[in-house]
């Protein structure tokens, strides 16, 4: 079972990478884009025979212990 986890900075955290992307797009003539935020996508596999509850528990534990800095980041499990 393929799991995708989207990690991004919390909304109130200044995001310089997104700002640089926005400025670069503007300089290339793409002035319609604004409020750009950049994140990371983590993909991992879990066995198919794992229960939904155990899957959720393992994902949450991995995110809290290693994958996400919950002080400045938030995450969303996709799909």
What does each model-found stretch correspond to?
Residues 1-79:
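Non-catalytic terminal accessory/regulatory regions of metabolic enzymes
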């Amino acid at each position: 079972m393929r799991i995708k986890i989207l990690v991004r900075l919390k909304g109130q955290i200044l995001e310089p990478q997104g700002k640089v992307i926005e400025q670069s797009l503007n300089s290339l003539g793409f002035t319609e884009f604004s409020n750009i935020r950049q994140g990371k996508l983590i993909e991992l596999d879990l066995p198919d025979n794992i229960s939904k509850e155990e899957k959720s528990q393992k994902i949450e534990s991995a995110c809290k212990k290693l994958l996400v800095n919950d002080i400045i980041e938030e995450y969303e499990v996709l799909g």
